[in-house]
Amino acid sequence: MGFGFKILVEQSIQLLTVAPRLVPEVLQQPTIRHPIAVSLGAIAGALSRYYLSLWFAQRFGITFPYGTLFINITGCLAMGFFYALALERLSLISPEIRLLVAVGFLGAYTTFSTYALDTFTLLGDRNLLAAGFYWAGSSILGVISIQIGIILGRLCQ
């Protein structure tokens, strides 16, 4: 997963940052480039989410949504870090790369609709303690992780 993801990201960045004279005219238009960037990021984000969820389910079982909890927290951390890095420090990052990472990858990687469904399922199973921990833990730790990510992003020079 890690090696393939790295290649996908490197190729995506290369595709989106190649010299304009080498790119067909149609690909120079933001109305084409932006959806391509989002799509490439979304593929990587969705696959990362899928494989991490499988790993957590195989490792810890399915009685508690550990994978979704981990994904939501790390996604918030990454979003905070990228926000601080891309918007506050490195304004040279192209709009396509920002879309690829923030909207595409992280948008597909962290979906709170799964969070809501998992909470609902735990409540339906009458597992109130786990449902309460999961519901509050995802929200509280997500907000804390955003803040930590921003702090870490601001520390990068």
Curated annotation (Swiss-Prot):
GO MF entry, a single one: metal ion binding
An example Gene Ontology biological process: cellular detoxification of fluoride
Modulation of this protein's activity: Na(+) is not transported, but it plays an essential structural role and its presence is essential for fluoride channel function.
Annotated binding of Na(+), by residue: 107, 110
InterPro entries referenced in this protein's UniProt entry, alphabetically: FluC
Catalytic activity: fluoride(in) = fluoride(out)
Keyword Metal-binding: yes
Subcellular location: Cell inner membrane
One Pfam family from the record: CRCB
TM spans (from-to): 36-56, 67-87, 100-120, 132-152
Record's bilayer topology term: Multi-pass membrane protein
Function text: Fluoride-specific ion channel. Important for reducing fluoride concentration in the cell, thus reducing its toxicity.
NCBIfam families listed in its UniProt record: crcB (TIGR00494)
Family of the protein in this entry: Belongs to the fluoride channel Fluc/FEX (TC 1.A.43) family.
HAMAP family xref list: FluC (MF_00454)
Name of this chain's protein: Fluoride-specific ion channel FluC
Native species: Nostoc sp. (strain PCC 7120 / SAG 25.82 / UTEX 2576)
Taxonomic placement: Bacteria, Bacillati, Cyanobacteriota, Cyanophyceae, Nostocales
Gene name of the record: fluC
